[in-house]
Amino acid sequence: AEVATLTNSALTLKGTTPTLTIGDAGAEDTKIVFDGNAQDYYIGLDDGTDDLLIGLGNAVGTTPAISIDENLAITTAGDITMGGTTPTLTIGDAGAEDAKIVFDGNALDMHVGLDDSADELVIGKGSALGTTAHIITDTNGIVRMPLQCSFGVRLNATVNNATGDNTRYTVPFDAAEWDVNSDFDLANNKFVAPVDGTYCFNAGIALAQVATNHTQIDAFFYDETDNWYQHNLDVGNVFNNSNNYYFTLSATIKMAAGVDVVAQVQVANGSKVIDVFGASYPFTWMTGFLVG
């Protein structure tokens, strides 16, 4: 073997195209080793993987910090710190393609990326942009959460003789205008919170056959624990000339996952003759969404 040792010297390659070649095309690792006092480092070609490695120690393939493969894909084995006065990480080269960061999890992958076809910043599930988007921001700063809990339901047909004699009546919403995650249980006429959070609810209830002897009306959202009272008055003095009365409810409620919410109405001091209007459009209705 031929060995050249330079002591207390520097090696300079000159010329128009100075080149230093490590290796002779043989099937072996080639490397440069930096022989330090406390730590050694190497830069080398790992012949087994055909990757260029920068690593700790003097043996190629052990404790690599950075590897570059034949497709120019770079893999780092440690943390990356960007310093300077204005540290910037740029993803993409202004090409007409998606650019993204993928978080490769154990059971679930997530991504943050620029969807080039829509010109939108997307945060979503999986590794492919445009599929299962959770948060979308467009060029105008409009933010959408297409999978956020949101619903609108209505009473499809009029229910006769629901209250009037102090019966506390749960409005049986049975048709959905929309329900993003199917969180409203139409079979049991109630909303079921999918996650812990704060929810906003609104409702409009239309009553018929109200009479002057119906002197009290109460209406509220009920969340299995509390009555969120919205309405209390002498309904027998405020109905219209068709003996109908329309009113709305609104409440923001902090709920645990699995808790139910229903809309209820109770009219007292008269006969049980009051109907709740229903229709093929939102006549008596309820909406809600997750605030956060």
What are these regions (language model features)?
Residues 2, 9-64, 70-132, 149, ...:
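Self-maturation zones of extracellular/virion spikes and adhesins
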Residues 3, 65, 134, 188-190, ...:
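Short basic coil micro-motifs at the edges of alpha-helical modules that engage polyanionic partners
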Residues 6, 45-47, 68, 114-116, ...:
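Generic beta-strand structural signal
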Residues 138-292:
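Extracellular jelly-roll beta-sandwich "head" domains, especially the C-terminal globular C1q domain
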